[in-house]
């Protein structure tokens, strides 16, 4: 028996229902052959915010973005701003600042690249621990992204990822991380079911086919775990709400990208995806390092809260109380998520359930909450909002857009006709395909990390949130790939 390997393919922005439909109609033959059993094709819940970058971290660390202090693809650090020392206390990973991601999340947390040093990384913005030779797209990633941004030729980048993936096998690696970006970007540019997006799914199928043929040629197939996952889903966007401009229209002076040279600001709006946003609020005339708790937001910014809830573009808003509980508001009601420790939560509602669950009040562990909410509009909503507020960079108010809307308008070039980042199922439910069968239980993307370590025979580091889901034998399968619409939408 040869030593084991793992190849982790991030099929960026792929939807499980679209994959299921294309497999059922015979349009993805290589993927169907590579993952032939239902136990090899599972739904999983991603993390909030459901956006590239922060949503890579669960795969590579087994932890949530909030626990790693990377709460969005754009963030503002009010604690660092109050101190005014060191690096600028804000980021946008849409561009050259993506090269700062490795230094921006917790330094004490090992990545798969650290644990499996014979590694290769292809087009990943998170690659801390990968050896120099294994960073196969290093500086060239920015050039390829710039080329595709101005030409819309993401197909060329997808093919380049395929070539680099196959070339990485020459290194005899134990772990390969490969991002395939074209489904996501063609979805943004058109629609998640447009002809260009579907063509990108077919190119993904070609990549899987060539990879498996090469594994067979090298006689590595039986000892290689191939995992194909998505970091987020996608849904059509018909209306944009420019949240920073909307805040300015209400009398605020917001700091936001790309207008980062403004220093006379009383708020900050950091949009991710573009389906979610952090809103930071200044107390009085000076910025203080502590987050503004829910009690003060209600007292001093009640008009803002009410105005946000009146907007049809906004589905959920959340704040954090001084006692650590997260308050969730929507037009349907108010909920409180109280962490009790050891992965347990108390959930209560007032005036209706903001998530629309109904009947979920009480004390739950995280796994049971996931199981109870998996088929709802907001799968894993309480757990995901609570983890996000672990980060001191998380806003005083967290906003999740409604389906069909996003939160960035005039400064998004090119315009997004499909998006992600929000808390609803369209963006949170993703495919997890594995050549080793997975158990018939609710899954999260944080589970990928410990499952890979199990396959590789490595111990799981302390503090990991995810669960090892590797199973050698399974009961008959009943799960289906849930799409963003309903469990019945899938062709799996």
Regions inferred by a protein language model and the residue ranges of each:
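His/Asp/Glu-rich, glycine-adjacent segments
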Residues: 55-203, 327-375, 394, 404-408
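Polar, surface-exposed loop/tail segments
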Residues: 317-330, 458-483, 490-492
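Beta-strand elements within well-structured catalytic alpha/beta cores of enzymes
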Residues: 3-19, 34, 59, 116, ...
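Low-complexity, glycine/alanine/valine/leucine- and proline-rich hydrophobic stretches
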Residues: 390-449, 457
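Active-site-proximal N-terminal segment of extracellular/periplasmic enzymes that hydrolyze or transfer
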Residues: 1-40, 50, 464
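Short secondary-structure boundary/capping segments
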Residues: 22-26, 136-138, 191-197, 240-247, ...
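Secreted, luminal/periplasmic, and some membrane-associated catalytic domains
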Residues: 26, 42-45, 49-51, 73-101, ...
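A short beta-strand-to-alpha-helix junction
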Residues: 261-275, 288-301, 437-470
């Amino acid at each position: 028996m040869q030593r084991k390997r793992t190849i982790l393919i991030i099929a960026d922005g792929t939807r499980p229902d679209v994959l299921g439909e294309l497999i059922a109609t015979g349009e993805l033959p290589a993927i169907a052959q590579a993952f032939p059993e239902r136990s090899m094709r599972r739904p999983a819940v991603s993390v909030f915010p459901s956006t590239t970058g922060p949503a890579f971290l669960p795969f590579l660390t087994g932890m949530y973005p909030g626990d790693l202090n990377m709460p969005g693809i754009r963030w503002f650090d009010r604690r660092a701003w109050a101190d005014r020392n060191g690096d600028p206390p804000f980021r946008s990973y849409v561009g050259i600042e993506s090269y700062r991601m490795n230094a921006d999340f917790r330094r004490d947390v090992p990545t798969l690249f650290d644990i499996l040093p014979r590694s290769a990384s292809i087009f990943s913005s998170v690659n801390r621990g990968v050896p120099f030779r294994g960073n196969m797209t290093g500086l060239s990633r920015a050039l390829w992204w710039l080329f595709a941004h101005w030409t819309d030729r993401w197909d060329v980048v997808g093919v380049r990822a395929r070539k680099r993936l196959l070339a990485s096998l020459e290194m005899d690696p134990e772990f390969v991380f490969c991002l395939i970006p074209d489904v996501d970007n063609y979805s943004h540019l058109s629609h998640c079911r447009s002809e260009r997006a579907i063509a990108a799914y077919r190119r993904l199928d070609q990549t899987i086919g060539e990879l498996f043929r090469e594994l067979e040629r090298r006689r590595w197939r039986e000892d290689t775990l191939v995992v194909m996952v998505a970091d987020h889903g996608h849904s059509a966007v018909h209306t944009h709400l420019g949240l920073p401009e909307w805040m300015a229209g209400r009398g605020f002076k917001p700091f936001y990208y790309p207008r980062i040279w403004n220093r006379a600001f009383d708020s900050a709006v950091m949009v991710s995806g573009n389906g979610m946003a952090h809103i930071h609020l200044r107390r009085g005339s000076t910025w203080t390092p502590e987050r503004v708790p829910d009690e003060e937001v209600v007292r001093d910014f009640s008009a803002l809260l009410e105005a946000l809830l009146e907007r049809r573009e906004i589905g959920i808003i959340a704040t954090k109380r001084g006692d650590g509980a997260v308050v969730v508001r929507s037009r349907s009601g108010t909920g409180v998520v109280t962490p009790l420790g050891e992965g347990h939560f108390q959930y209560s509602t007032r005036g209706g359930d903001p998530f629309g669950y109904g009947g979920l009040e009480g004390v739950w562990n995280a796994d049971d909450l996931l199981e109870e909410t998996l088929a709802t509009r907001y799968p894993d909503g309480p757990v995901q909002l609570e983890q996000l507020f672990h980060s001191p960079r998380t806003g005083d108010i967290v906003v999740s857009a409604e389906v069909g809307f996003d939160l960035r308008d005039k400064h998004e070039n090119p315009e997004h006709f499909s998006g992600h980042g929000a808390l609803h199922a369209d963006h949170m439910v993703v495919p997890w395909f594995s050549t080793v069968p997975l158990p018939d239980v609710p899954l999260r993307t944080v589970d990928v990390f410990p499952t890979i370590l199990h396959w590789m025979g490595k111990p799981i580091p302390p503090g990991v949130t995810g669960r090892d889901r590797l199973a050698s034998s399974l009961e008959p399968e009943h799960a289906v790939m849930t799409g963003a619409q309903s469990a019945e939408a899938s062709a799996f």
